[in-house]
Amino acid sequence: MGKGKNHDRKANPGFGKVKSKTGTSTGEFTLKRVKGENFYRDAKSASRVKMLNGGKAVRDRDGKIVEAAAFQKGEKEAEPGRVKPDRRWFGNTRVISQSALDHFRTALKEQKADPYSVLLKRNKLPMGFGSRKNRKQRPHIVETEPFGNTFGPKAQRKRPRLDIGKGNGTADLADIYHPTTSTAREPIYAKGTSRRIWGELYKVLDSSDVVIHVLDARDPLGTRCKPVVEYLRKEKAHKHLVYVLNKVDLVPTWVTARWVKHLSLSAPTIAFHASINNSFGKGSLIQLLRQFSVLHSDKKQISVGFIGYPNTGKSSIINTLKKKKVCTVAPIPGETKVWQYITLMRRIYLIDCPGIVPVSAKDSDTDTVLKGVVRVENLATPAEHIPALLERVRPEYLERTYGLEHVEGGWHGEEGATFVLTAIAKKSGKLLKGGEPDQEAAAKMVLNDWIRGKVPFFVAPPTKPESGADAHVSSATTEKVQEQEQKELAEEKETKEMLEEQERSLGKVLGIKRVKGVEQPISKIVTMTKFLGDDARRYVEEEEVDVDDVDKEMAEEDEDEDEDDDDDVEESGEDQEEEELAWDDVFPEEAAGVDAADGEEVEEDDEEEEGDEDDEDVPSAKQLGKRKAIDSDEEEQTAIKAKRMTTNKQKASNFYTHANVKNRNRDRKVPKNPGKRSRGDDEPTGKKAKKRR
């Protein structure tokens, strides 16, 4: 036991003695503790004493337990018992039947196929079951290959079942679609495939919650990084993918509408034109990003990464959203070297990424050059890429752009490329010694115009009739290949019909996909390049009519919801509309005559007032009635005009007809304020003005 308050101090004669500073002990007793201090045991010392003394039973003289120790059971408590059998004690805590699991798997697949549904919480869901195949299905091996023919003495050697035929056509097709390349490839064609750039890409993918894939509207499928999209869907399924169709001002509006409709089945797609002063799609993209930030309300901010091919306009889109130059921009590829963080709003950050090029066996050196991956000035022989360019561009556009003479059938092959480059070099004055045309310099000029959009070109949307030479289809020169292509036309039609059916079926299952609250008037896009009549046409088909009907239905639904909420507001709005419809709107000519008559009456009244200035008598009743009527008419007209002027609805106008873009409208003289008269009309100048002052 510890020492209490009243223990014997005589047993310890040195108790209470304190050493002095010199080290000698004095006989005087001094108090160790300050008066008022608690000298009882604290909690720590009390628990230690309890640990030492506890754990033992209290017994009497005979050894019988009087008080049991802690955690000690008596004989009565230790009687044998029996637990009632129940599955809840011995079964699994989380179980699911196979039918429920199959239902979950099918529902999960349908939701995964829908790019417009977002899974907010996934911590307690068995997401691995969605990727597994159904284990109930047994492999039908015995039906395809019997056991006796596979194993045993009657086993047969397996050979591929091929149709017997000649391999000439197959070899020609292989040369067309997969041309042989030299083993030693120039390093300039490997731009965008280095480990450093792909390291920057994976930094952006890991850091971003929303990934925006920027596509070129002239060739969306050609500028899509398919391996990156598949990687995001398999490994990063929780990240959102959005397609942005940039450079829509370089293609007709019907092409943009088709591509948006086609790409919207796989991911939300937005048409965009990057320009700080005159952009298209900026509000729609910001609205979409705000919706994603609302979905991730548990996070302080979200990051949006921009990926895509070089020279597709990733940095230009960021500058457009910020409305100022925050990223370096150039019309040549490879300007962005490293990733860059930009703050768009308090909760939305943007990440700029350098352009990447996926390694694909189908892309040749010419394809990489025509996609704008390589800088043209660094090419050693740019003239070798011109024949492929001539196959993709209509001859009329080259004639119009460079002022060439018309040739029936256009130019094909190396001979046509030589003729075109020679004519362009002579016209532009690019000559070598002796007056020979510099074809390489002319080829660089044509390729630069091609990349910057001065030469009109676009790839026709899939599953639709192609527009002549604009479609990205390689035309053959030999007769054998032409015959082979004619045979394949029927197969291509069948595949197109199959694709159309798949697209329609997918559209029926998923519905017409569009993000609610994000609408784009694609018909109002101002195209910079002028296309010919058959290229600038716009198809009106059943599908587009269905889209318009769906838009009307969505608008009607929104109106119904608004009606339920604000009935009084709409009634007042209807009254305002009825008031706005005035006599001037219905009969403008008669209204003009009435206004003129009113003006004459007002002038007469003014003259009468000027004549009667000296006589300040009360005017007659007729004059009062006239003035009141005129004043009331003027008040009504001013009220109507005020309503029209204060409305926030602006009429659509073309930006390039009003603004002085590149000094095109510098000769046009428009006064700053036509309503006001000039200073010379109001005040006299010269000596007369000085005299009056």
UniProtKB/Swiss-Prot annotation:
Basic and acidic residues composition-biased segments: 480-500
Residues annotated as binding GTP: 308-315, 352-356
Biased composition (Basic residues): 661-677
Pfam family, one: MMR_HSR1
Alphabetically ordered keywords of this record: GTP-binding, Nucleotide-binding, Nucleus, Ribosome biogenesis
Molecular function per GO: GTP binding
Ranges of biased composition (kind: Acidic residues): 541-588, 597-618
Comp. bias regions, Polar residues: 647-660
Name the record gives this protein: Nucleolar GTP-binding protein 2
Organism for this UniProt entry: Cryptococcus neoformans var. grubii
